[in-house]
Design a protein with these regions (language model features):
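Hydrophobic alpha-helical transmembrane segments of multipass integral membrane proteins
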Residues: 29, 33, 137, 141-149, ...
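Glycine/proline-centered hinge or cleavage motifs at structural transition points of membrane proteins
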Residues: 186, 245-246, 259
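Periplasmic/extracellular loop-to-transmembrane helix junction in inner-membrane transport proteins
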Residues: 6-16, 72-92, 106-146, 168, ...
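Generic hydrophobic transmembrane alpha-helix motif, especially the helices
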Residues: 179-216
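Transmembrane-helix boundary motif in ABC transporter permease subunits
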Residues: 33-45, 146-179, 192, 339-345
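Transmembrane alpha-helical segments of polytopic membrane transport and secretion proteins
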Residues: 36-96, 339-350
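Interhelical loop and adjacent transmembrane-helix boundary motif
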Residues: 1-27, 283-329
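Transmembrane alpha-helices
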Residues: 226-227, 235, 249-285
Length: 350
């Protein structure tokens, strides 16, 4: 992914084809991993298959070892000691990770907050200086366009998967494998795909519209899966009660199912907003990296994260880089706090 990000901007001919092939291999690798996980989860792979190839991989009969293993000689005192040791190890690991995260947050805020000012946020960005005002406008434009496309598609796709399709159908498994695979693909691969399709094929050029369409591809899998999991968690008795009272399938979905799953849909939207605001790799080659205000969706525009990358790459705007990072960090903290509050407010007990 690093090679794709660094070299795709100027690659041509065989060099560019090799980078595209690298992204394709990465996509196939992630897809293969998800297929294996689904087979294991669905008990399609068992230990008998593994033991049948033990001569190749030097794996002994796992089932036999498990069956012969016994806890009868383990004393309760030793179990208690091991449990205490595990508890303190877990506490220590939690403290270390929390302190490390807190150090990063405080370091960025201390370095960046003093340099956040009106001129940085709303000043004119030109050849002599760079400000965040074009990034604010570009990010807002991409947020609006990507969410207005991705949310309806994602929600209605989840409705189809949970309400109309067969629960254990092969098509459903295939769709879930592909959505999970897309969720695990690095964003630079989406950026490469967006550049090939929206820029080269459709001729949009590096524009806010091309970046927005690329963001749709990035956030759509998470919206589908989050909404689907929410709708699956709704008890079937609510649907059956509505249908028993004479309500149609469509009315049951819009009056019973969606209101009950509203908190999950909002969660998916908020997480998508955080992903969009912090996205950079996929947008460098689709929406562009410019310091000017976009005149419309067909013009190039830089998001917050791309503008931070531009600040750092210039070498003259280190303070502005930390200021932008502080703003992004505060946005993420605010979104997570909002998510926590809304989950507590909108959570339903069935």
């Amino acid at each position: 992914t690093i090679n794709i990000a660094l070299e795709m901007g100027y690659a041509t001919g065989i060099h560019r084809s090799s980078l595209i092939a690298t992204a394709f291999v990465l996509l196939l690798f992630i897809l293969l991993l998800n297929i294996i996980l689904y087979l294991i989860k669905g008990n399609h792979i068992n230990f008998d298959f593994i033991t049948s190839i033990k001569d190749l991989f030097f794996i002994k009969n796992i089932k036999k070892n498990i069956n012969e293993f016994s806890f009868k000689n383990i004393k309760m005192k030793n179990v208690s000691i091991k449990s205490e040791i595990l508890k303190y190890i877990s506490i220590f690991a939690t403290i270390i990770s929390t302190l490390f995260l807190l150090f990063i947050v405080l370091f960025i805020l201390i370095r960046g907050l003093p340099y956040i000012n009106f001129n940085l946020l709303f000043g004119e960005s030109n050849n002599s200086q760079m400000t965040l005002f074009p990034a604010i406008v570009s990010t807002a434009m991409m947020l609006f366009m990507s969410l207005i496309i991705a949310v309806p598609i994602g929600v209605f796709s989840a409705i189809y998967l949970t309400e109309y399709s067969k629960a254990n159908g092969k098509l459903i498994y295939a769709i879930r494998i592909f959505t999970d695979s897309l969720s695990g693909i690095p964003s630079i691969v989406f950026g490469l795909f967006g550049m090939l399709i929206f820029l080269d094929l459709f001729g949009l050029g590096r524009s806010v519209l091309a970046g927005s369409l690329t963001l749709v591809l990035i956030i759509l899998p998470s919206i589908i899966r989050q909404t689907e999991e929410t709708l699956i968690s709704i008890p079937a008795s609510l649907r059956e009660g509505s249908l028993a009272l004479g309500a149609s399938k469509v009315r049951t979905i819009f009056k019973i199912v969606l209101p009950c799953g509203f908190s999950g849909i909002i969660t998916a939207i908020i997480l998508s907003i955080g992903r969009i605001v912090g996205e950079s790799a996929a947008l460098i080659y689709t929406s562009g990296a410019v310091r000017y205000m976009p005149a419309g969706y067909l013009n190039a525009g830089s998001s917050f994260a791309v503008m931070m990358w531009m600040f750092s790459s210039e070498g003259l705007y280190i303070n502005q880089t930390f200021a932008t990072a502080s703003i992004l960090l505060m946005i993420v903290i605010f979104l997570n706090a909002l998510l926590f509050v809304l989950n507590n407010k909108l959570k339903k007990d069935y």
